């Protein structure tokens, strides 16, 4: 397992040097952020990013993400051209030696929260989705701008996209468009040596009348059966799936591990109910997820891949502008998960490897 950390490029207030100082940190999860959605990523852009990360003593373990254009999701006539561009990006990621691409197939926006600073009992704040906040709200009729929405759209464009989904695209239509996309890109991913890892819908249930399809156990089974290859895998985001109390994330994790189809791990904890959900500290007791149980499964199945602590509370005066992506709580989470990993590895009679090659610099006796 390679502990990894999301980094938003040169504009991220969290620096690579700060990330490198987290004990046991090996990988960076990042993307090319200056290429418009739908265009192919040039190889030189990827190599420049890779060099920057490697000069800091880290490696890019996952690209998160190459966004899927809405016209692909909606099955529009120009989707083949857009898919060819996507395939070019996959080839270039493979040529750069990066093994995994995380992506999603969520309509319009990547994730939705109603509150970025909801208080927790420990005095910190975190991201929350409170259904009561959105009761009776319509993003088409109301002047609404929620966290996680794609800022590349104007409000009028976003309203048009939402209306098209509502009127013309059912969940089965979205499934059909996803299948078309998967069957088009997977041979390229296999040839390039890149494993694809679809992220679940966040939250994993319908909102605003939009179709949502990657939501739970049955959806994961259906998705994996679209194309039978280890390159067609999932991002096991336990926090996203656990945001719906109906999902048994331990059972889902074991199912996907048995099929060797977890290509990336996101680990955040949540507490959830009929009211919605709130993200918590990573500790098992802080939320609904048995995090030790999750890590034990990874060890039991000898899972080899990148895991990143996903989202963090706002603590210790963290002023990051990207919700959930401050340094401090994610660093605590990384250390916590490395501790769980070492404990479970040693209990299984195995020796964990955190990639630490040099234990000191200079004269040990000085």
UniProtKB/Swiss-Prot annotation:
Entry's EC annotation: 4.2.1.8
UniProt keyword terms in alphabetical order: Iron, Lyase, Manganese
One biological process term in Gene Ontology: D-glucuronate catabolic process
Catalysed reactions, semicolon-separated: D-mannonate = 2-dehydro-3-deoxy-D-gluconate + H2O
Top EC group: lyase
Secretion signal, residue range per the UniProt entry: none
Cofactor(s) the record lists: Fe(2+); Mn(2+)
Pathway participation: Carbohydrate metabolism; pentose and glucuronate interconversion
Entry's Gene Ontology molecular function annotations: ferrous iron binding; manganese ion binding; mannonate dehydratase activity
UniProt similarity note: Belongs to the mannonate dehydratase family.
Task performed by this protein: Catalyzes the dehydration of D-mannonate.
Protein name: Mannonate dehydratase
The species this protein was found in: Streptococcus pneumoniae (strain 70585)
